[in-house]
Amino acid sequence: MTMADVKQANKDAGYYFFSRDTMRFFGTRIVSALYKNNTFITSDYTDFERNNRAYSVRVFHPETGIVNTAKFSDGKSTFNKFSTIESAREFARNYKAA
């Protein structure tokens, strides 16, 4: 499965994660391919001034088309928690849903 497939599945399920307006509002950029565990990495603005960016690990659920943000083992969100692409990649590659 490719990111194009993920985008289409999300849209077909009636969701807007990848819509132009949604991505523009959050300043979201997709910065990785889809990993085997259905995760991928985004870069988003960390503030409304749009000066800083951080990385988040996202999870695609093929059975529903939903995309959500991965969680750490303590249940906290990974949204904008990675300051480097390398740290986000390591987490994404090793992610196992709870």
Specify the residue positions occupied by each region the protein language model found.
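A short, charged, amphipathic alpha-helix used as a generic interaction element across diverse proteins
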Residues: 70-98
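Short N-terminal "domain-start" leader segments
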Residues: 1-71
